[in-house]
């Protein structure tokens, strides 16, 4: 029996924070200058729409659609391909594939930039499936995505979820999937007290060394 590996994307396989924050700050400076400080410290992980709501706050709700549109233009066309994979990401994905494990993505990142970046990195052969929240309008969160799209869990010897935020841990816990915390990502300062973690890793090389 093979194993199933579910990976988050931003903050787990790729370090997208510099580019994404650069875009958030640039657009916030244009639309809502008083919120720049908030944008500079925003957690990378929630969907674009959720983040736009957080940055703009209730006082600027009428700007949300414009914010999202400007972000997509700036990020997808100018910034996306500057994103770097984490060290050992390619090696870890290749290692799991060579062991005949199934590897999938479950991410809040939009589908278009996710697939464009995966193609640019040459990672398409590694993934059996790529799940991006904006492509599944009927699901309210990543936990719903996993629950409804991953069928026949009993066919796998083991299932693991690797992610870097509390939302990832919650998703794994709600679906009774062992969670591996990638502490090199963006969720280090979050409150992890209610999340069950089977292993914490400081590098993706630990996937190769321990699994």
Identify the residue ranges that each predicted region occupies.
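N-terminal helical cap/lid subdomain that shapes the substrate entry/recognition surface
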Residues: 2-91
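Conserved phosphate-coupling serine/threonine residues in phosphotransfer and NTP-handling enzymes
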Residues: 12, 107-109
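Conserved H-loop
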Residues: 34, 124-128, 156, 198
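Conserved Lys-Pro-Asp/Glu-containing loop-to-beta segment of HAD-superfamily phosphomonoesterases
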Residues: 4, 141-169
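Acidic, Mg2+-coordinating phosphoryl-transfer loop and its flanking beta/alpha structural elements
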Residues: 161-199
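Short, acidic loop-to-helix structural element flanking the phosphoryl-transfer center
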Residues: 77-105, 112-115, 140-143
């Amino acid at each position: 029996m093979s194993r199933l590996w579910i990976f988050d994307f931003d903050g787990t396989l790729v370090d997208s924070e510099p580019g994404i924050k650069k875009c958030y700050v640039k657009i916030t400076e244009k639309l809502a200058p008083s919120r720049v400080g908030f944008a500079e410290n925003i957690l990378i992980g929630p969907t674009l729409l959720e983040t736009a709501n957080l940055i703009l706050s209730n006082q600027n709700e009428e700007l949300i659609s414009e914010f999202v549109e400007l972000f997509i233009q700036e990020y997808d066309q100018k910034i996306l391909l500057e994103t770097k994979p984490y060290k050992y990401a390619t090696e870890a994905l290749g290692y799991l594939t060579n062991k005949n494990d199934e590897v999938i993505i479950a991410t809040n990142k939009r589908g278009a930039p996710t697939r464009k970046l995966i193609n640019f990195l040459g990672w398409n052969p590694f993934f059996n499936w790529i799940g991006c929240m904006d492509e599944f309008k009927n699901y309210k969160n990543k936990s719903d995505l996993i629950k409804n799209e991953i069928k026949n869990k009993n066919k796998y010897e083991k299932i693991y979820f690797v992610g870097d935020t509390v939302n990832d841990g919650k998703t794994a816990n709600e679906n009774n999937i062992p969670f591996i915390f990638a502490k090199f990502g963006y969720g280090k300062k979050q409150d992890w007290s209610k999340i069950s973690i089977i292993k914490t890793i400081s590098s993706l090389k630990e996937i190769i060394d321990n699994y």
